[in-house]
Amino acid sequence: MDQLRQSLLEAPIIEKGEYEYFVHPISDGVPMLEPGLLREIVIKIIRKADLEDVDKIVTPAAMGIHISTAVSLMTDIPLVVIRKREYGLDGEISLSQQTGYSENDMFINDVSEDDRVLVIDDVLSTGGTMCAVLDALKSTGAEVVDTVAVIKKAGPNELDDTDHHVKTLINVTVEDGEVVIVDENGDD
C-alpha cells in the first residue's frame, strides 16, 4: 500500500461548520510530514505532469509551497508562490480566493504573458482557489501547461463547468467521519 493512500486512510476528521475536513500532513502540515511521503508525492507529480517547456511552477500559499518546492528542486524549474499579501510590485495581479470555509485576496507576481506554467496545489475540494488561480493566470496571457492537485475531495466543485482541467494523484471523500478512497490513481 502506498504511503499517500495509507496516510489518508489514517487521517483524523474535524468539522468546520457543516464541512467535514480531513487533517493531513500534505494539506495542513500536521501531523508531521514524513520525507518518504513527500518524496512519493513529488515522484508521482513529476510522472503525471506535462513538464515539457514549463518555465515556472506556480502554487498558492501556503500548503502548496512544500510540495512545489520539492518539485522545483527535482526539475530545476523556478517557483512562483501566490501570496495572501500584497506587495505592490509592477505586474502584480490580485485574485479572490473562496474555499468551503474562507475567503481571501491573493496576489500573483513574476508571471507574464507567454510564460508556460505548471500549477501545483495540495487539495482540490470546492475548486474555489484553483478556479481563481487558473482564471487569473489566463488573464496574464500565461499558458497553463498543466495543473496538478495532490488530493481531490470528490464531489461537485467550481471547475466542473469550466474548461480548466486538473490532474490529481488520488481522489477521496469523507463518509461518516472517515476518509474513503474513491480513485487511488486520481484524475489524468
From Swiss-Prot:
Its EC number is 2.4.2.-. This is HGPRTase-like protein. It comes from Halogeometricum borinquense (strain ATCC 700274 / DSM 11551 / JCM 10706 / KCTC 4070 / PR3). It holds the Pfam family Pribosyltran. SUPFAM superfamilies: PRTase-like. PANTHER family: HYPOXANTHINE/GUANINE PHOSPHORIBOSYLTRANSFERASE, XANTHINE PHOSPHORIBOSYLTRANSFERASE. GO terms for biological process: purine ribonucleoside salvage. CDD domains: PRTases_typeI. Coiled coil: none annotated. It comes from the Archaea.
